[in-house]
UniProtKB/Swiss-Prot annotation:
One GO term (biological process): translation
Keywords, alphabetical: Ribonucleoprotein, Ribosomal protein, RNA-binding, rRNA-binding, tRNA-binding
UniProt-listed HAMAP family: Ribosomal_uL5_B (MF_01333_B)
Gene Ontology cellular-component terms listed: ribonucleoprotein complex; ribosome
Family stated for the protein in its record: Belongs to the universal ribosomal protein uL5 family.
One Pfam family matching this protein: Ribosomal_L5_C
Designated name of the protein: Large ribosomal subunit protein uL5
Record bears the keyword RNA-binding: yes
GO molecular function terms noted in the UniProt entry: rRNA binding; structural constituent of ribosome; tRNA binding
Function: This is one of the proteins that bind and probably mediate the attachment of the 5S RNA into the large ribosomal subunit, where it forms part of the central protuberance. In the 70S ribosome it contacts protein S13 of the 30S subunit (bridge B1b), connecting the 2 subunits; this bridge is implicated in subunit movement. Contacts the P site tRNA; the 5S rRNA and some of its associated proteins might help stabilize positioning of ribosome-bound tRNAs.
Origin species: Gloeothece citriformis (strain PCC 7424)
Record InterPro entries: Ribosomal_uL5, Ribosomal_uL5_bac-type, Ribosomal_uL5_C, Ribosomal_uL5_CS, Ribosomal_uL5_dom_sf, Ribosomal_uL5_N
NCBIfam families for this protein: PRK00010.1
Length: 180
C-alpha cells in the first residue's frame, strides 16, 4: 500500500515544481530522501528506565526500533564516560518516512499549543530542514498516562534540493505549515 503523501508527491507536486523551477528532467525535481528523529537523553543518561521509555516512545511514534547513540569520549563536566548511552535515533526512509511525514504535518504539528506555523529559518543552506519539538504529547500515538517525563526531539528532513528555496517549495507543497 503506497502512502497518501507519496501519491500526492508523484501526481501533483512533481509537475508543479518541474514547471516552477523549469526543470528539463523529472529526476531534477527535489524529493525527500530520509527523515531522522533524534532525542538526546541529557541528564537521563544515568537512568536506565528513562532510556527504555525513550526507546519505547520513539518506536511508537515512528514505527521503527531506534538505535541507541553512545558517547564517543568521556566528558567530566557532563558526567559521561566513553560508551555511555547519550541518546536515541531513528532514520526513516521510503514508506515509513512518508507515513511519518504525513502524520507529522497533518496530525502532530497542529496539536502544538499556540501553533502559528513553523519557522522558515531552519534550512541548512542545502535544502535540508530541521525542527525541534518540545514535547512528545503532540503525537496521537503517545498515551498521556504512560509517560514519565515530557521530553522533546529533533526532526531533520533531508532532501535532494540544491538550495533552500527549492527545499522550502517542496515542503510547502507537501503541506508543511511555514510561518508567514
Amino acid at each position: 500500500m503506497t502512502q497518501r503523501l507519496k501519491t500526492v508527491y508523484y501526481e501533483t507536486i512533481v509537475p508543479k515544481l518541474k514547471e516552477q523551477f523549469n526543470y528539463t528532467n523529472i529526476h531534477q525535481v527535489p524529493k525527500v530522501i530520509k527523515v531522522t528523529v533524534n532525542r538526546g537523553l541529557g541528564d537521563a543518561s544515568q537512568n536506565a528506565k528513562a532510556l527504555e521509555s525513550s526507546i519505547a516512545e520513539l518506536a511508537t511514534i515512528t514505527g521503527q526500533k531506534p538505535v541507541v547513540t553512545r558517547a564517543r569520549k568521556a566528558i567530566a563536566g557532563f558526567k559521561i564516560r566513553k560508551g555511555m548511552p547519550v541518546g536515541v535515533m531513528v532514520t526513516l526512509r521510503s514508506e515509513r518516512m512518508y507515513a511519518f511525514l504525513d502524520r507529522l504535518i497533518s496530525l502532530a504539528l497542529p496539536r502544538i499549543r499556540d501553533f502559528r506555523g513553523i519557522s522558515g529559518n531552519s534550512f541548512d543552506g542545502r535544502g535540508n530542514y530541521s525542527l525541534g519539538i518540545r514535547e512528545q504529547l503532540i503525537f496521537p500515538e503517545i498515551d498521556y498516562d504512560k509517560i514519565d517525563q515530557i521530553r522533546g526531539m529533533d526532526i531533520s528532513i533531508i532532501t535532494t534540493a540544491q538550495t533552500d528555496e527549492e527545499g522550502r517549495a517542496l515542503l510547502t507543497e507537501m503541506g508543511m505549515p511555514f510561518r508567514k
